[in-house]
């Protein structure tokens, strides 16, 4: 059993009661909601005559269904308009802050909460969204929940949970130039599999993690769920504090000093006992690209699609399915695979540093003929910051479209979708069949810099080969 870990400390601080069957009633410090998984929860709440227990601990935004080209109301899609209108009514009725379009604070829920200083070390964070693990980058314990659990948190500000095991993933050395946190987490999922983390929290640690920016740590924790982990986290350190200082909702003055002292104490003890520990050499990781239909089917850009003989027998059936669906041949080099669409954005990679990395590749180059390439900032704040630095013009000059914030082509819940058998180079988090809107569309996951490299060449390319 793990002992002395950050996970243990945060768990113990938020325990309300031990329940029959071995679960624990856990206080939720921050509840994030959006337009997709909250409507049914509010209906269920009102059917029972209940009110939102802690509206001050509940924060809303709109992200999944918003168009990224024309955000004028009413939306062209009547269902999207109804979903947003419903969220607006529910938030108004229950006194919940809604960061709506044009507020200067709207964006993808897992982008705006950190930039507003809402996510802080030692918190428990819940949201009706799979990628809530993003917030673990701050030393929080954060997890996605279903609609019925959204109802429970609205009603009680608590949740019945089973305690997880804690696996520490230690990364020696440093990532090489042209290799990013996205490559690191795709490498982990490739190495361990998409189910390895079931029943676990992942603690990411080691010299390579210490060197990551907060935005890269968010990318890392965002995709812990794709490796089966319920949550992933990084111990809070000076990098965390430097990011948080001065943001709204964060303590200031003397309270700031007290907060940072307490936050430091939450880090896993030097003698912490983990249920499991695995080590990786960050220096050996290459830019990574998925070739199949799960995030675990990834390879280095300088590798070939694996043959069935190279795979574990248990992985061969899904590989055979992936070969057929993706129209890829075992042994085929992933570099050189042509793409149709290039998407930079999502809660995984829609932050300012992501856009800077992609813009560095796009600057002075042109999107290849026949390629549709577009950039969707993760929030209104990201968009305005990028525009202030001229990144939007860099992308436009290169032939990319510059869009308004939203989840966009990460998922098929808004107008940004693949068509037919199009294949996309995408900085998002899932490459499942149909994920990007077309039942036969294909997705190659990679870092924003790699997406930009694919956009200007027209095919999967090693960003390191393009130089400055």
UniProtKB/Swiss-Prot annotation:
Keywords: 4Fe-4S, Amino-acid biosynthesis, Branched-chain amino acid biosynthesis, Iron, Iron-sulfur, Leucine biosynthesis, Lyase, Metal-binding. Pathway: Amino-acid biosynthesis; L-leucine biosynthesis; L-leucine from 3-methyl-2-oxobutanoate: step 2/4. SUPFAM superfamilies: Aconitase iron-sulfur domain. Binds 1 [4Fe-4S] cluster per subunit. [4Fe-4S] cluster binds at residues 347, 407, 410. Its EC number is 4.2.1.33. GO terms for biological process: L-leucine biosynthetic process. PROSITE patterns: ACONITASE_1 (PS00450), ACONITASE_2 (PS01244). It is an enzyme of class 4 (lyase). GO terms for molecular function: 3-isopropylmalate dehydratase activity; 4 iron, 4 sulfur cluster binding; metal ion binding. Its cofactor is [4Fe-4S] cluster. InterPro entries: 3-IsopropMal_deHydase_lsu (IPR004430), Acnase/IPM_dHydase_lsu_aba_1/3 (IPR015931), Acoase/IPM_deHydtase_lsu_aba (IPR001030), Aconitase_4Fe-4S_BS (IPR018136), Aconitase_4Fe-4S_dom (IPR036008), IPM_dehydratase_rel_enz (IPR050067), IPMI_cat (IPR033941). Gene3D superfamilies: Aconitase, domain 3. Pfam families: Aconitase. It catalyses: (2R,3S)-3-isopropylmalate = (2S)-2-isopropylmalate. It comes from the Bacteria. Belongs to the aconitase/IPM isomerase family. LeuC type 1 subfamily. HAMAP family: LeuC_type1. PANTHER family: 3-ISOPROPYLMALATE DEHYDRATASE (PTHR43822:SF9), HOMOACONITASE, MITOCHONDRIAL-RELATED (PTHR43822). Heterodimer of LeuC and LeuD. Catalyzes the isomerization between 2-isopropylmalate and 3-isopropylmalate, via the formation of 2-isopropylmaleate. This is 3-isopropylmalate dehydratase large subunit. It comes from Synechococcus sp. (strain CC9311). The gene is leuC.
